[in-house]
């Protein structure tokens, strides 16, 4: 059950990534194609390795998310920048998290937050500790959750709600296994959206 819930990397992302590599080759931009392919291969390896684990070091999870953001930024013509920040008090090697549990929210920030935005956008992924919880927050300065959805070519219908449902199920399992609260909440900002995912602090033995 847990493994099925973890296997949620969007097949459309993989399809789009391969299309981007093909486009670089066709435009005779081999350096870009090689760089993109290297990052894509690294992400796929991390996803496959991490999907076998119920928890992975925060450092590994953030590396996968960084690769994902890098690829989506390149694929979309660099229409957004991104920042990943971690509270220096957090040991990224010893702190464990469910792999890619925040990826659907990062994806939503890109596909929906950035899709209808005029000009360049920014996405921030931040990690901090709050009492005995780890807070992973995704914030964008995009159009907001209540703006009319702009359909993106290749995007599956109801993908957002499905990803949210899967993530909720994963967090419910974490809560059941750890016996401590785990969940997420949306915060509507004057410009954009913030999602906070709260997890019980889990550290390597």
Feature locations, PLM:
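Hydrophobic core positions in the C-terminal catalytic ATP-binding module
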Residues: 82, 123, 193-199
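A short beta-strand-to-loop micro-motif at the C-terminal edge of the catalytic HATPase_c
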Residues: 183-192
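Secondary-structure transition/turn motif
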Residues: 140-142, 197-201
């Amino acid at each position: 059950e847990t493994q099925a819930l973890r296997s949620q990397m969007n097949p459309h992302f993989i399809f789009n990534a391969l299309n981007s590599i093909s486009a670089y080759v066709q435009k005779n931009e081999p350096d870009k194609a090689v760089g993109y392919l290297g990052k894509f291969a690294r992400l796929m390896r991390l996803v496959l390795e991490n999907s076998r684990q119920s928890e992975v070091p925060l450092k590994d999870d953030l590396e996968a998310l960084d690769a994902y953001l890098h690829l989506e930024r390149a694929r979309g013509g660099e229409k957004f920048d991104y920042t990943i920040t971690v509270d220096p008090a957090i040991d990224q090697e010893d702190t464990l998290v469910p792999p890619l549990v925040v990826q659907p929210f990062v994806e939503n920030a890109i596909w929906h937050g950035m899709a209808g935005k005029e000009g360049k956008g920014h996405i921030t992924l931040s990690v901090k500790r709050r009492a005995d919880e780890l807070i992973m927050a995704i914030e964008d300065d995009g159009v907001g959750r209540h703006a009319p959805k702009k359909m993106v070519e290749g995007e599956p219908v109801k993908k957002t709600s499905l990803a949210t449902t899967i993530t909720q199920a994963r967090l419910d399992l974490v809560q059941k296994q750890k016996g401590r609260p785990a969940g997420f909440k949306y915060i509507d900002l004057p410009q954009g959206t913030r999602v906070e995912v709260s997890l019980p602090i889990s550290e390597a033995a």
